[in-house]
Amino acid sequence: MKIYLNVSCLNRPFDDQEQARIRLEAAAVGMILERVDEGHWTHVSSEIALIEIAANPDPERRARVHLLLPDSANIVMLTPATYARGEALESLGFKAADALHIAASEAAKADVLLSCDDRFCRTAERSARRLHVRLRNPMAWFDEVEHAPDAT
């Protein structure tokens, strides 16, 4: 299974863990990355994630988040086709960067795109029939996968 974690997920382990929701999402992201490390799933990402991470003004956090990225073979570069798909997705109400995450995850043939951004998830839910990837919150998705009859 190919898992695309957007930058909100990659940042979650380094966010202030005072709120229960943040702790639970961070734990879910950690367990997902453990499954990736164990070879059960493949982590894919994209050039837009690299751009967003590079824009973080905190060098320590930027370095820590960068360590969570997959190897370069699993990073989708942005192409004219990806940008065109991103523009089409923007017309559905997605922010530009979010649209590019979707376009890149579709290009990578990801099974799921995970995000901690509620607005992004709600917009995706409204547009689900027009997307070629499922977009979910990492905590909800991991719980769903763990309780599936054929859980890995």
Identify the function of each model-found stretch.
Residues 77, 96-99, 115:
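Short beta-strand scaffold positions
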Residues 94-96, 100-103, 110:
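Mid-chain, well-packed structural core segment of small domains
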Residues 9, 49, 82, 100-101, ...:
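Alpha-helix capping/helix-boundary segments
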Residues 51-55, 94, 118-120:
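Acidic, metal-coordinating catalytic cores used for nucleic-acid/nucleotide bond scission
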Residues 32, 64-65, 101:
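Residues within well-ordered alpha-helices
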Residues 4-57, 70, 75, 139-144:
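PIN/NYN-family metal-dependent endoribonuclease catalytic core
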Residues 2, 11, 16-26, 91, ...:
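Acidic, PIN/NYN-like endoribonuclease modules and their adjacent C-terminal/linker elements
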Residues 62-87:
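Helix-adjacent hinge/juxtasegments
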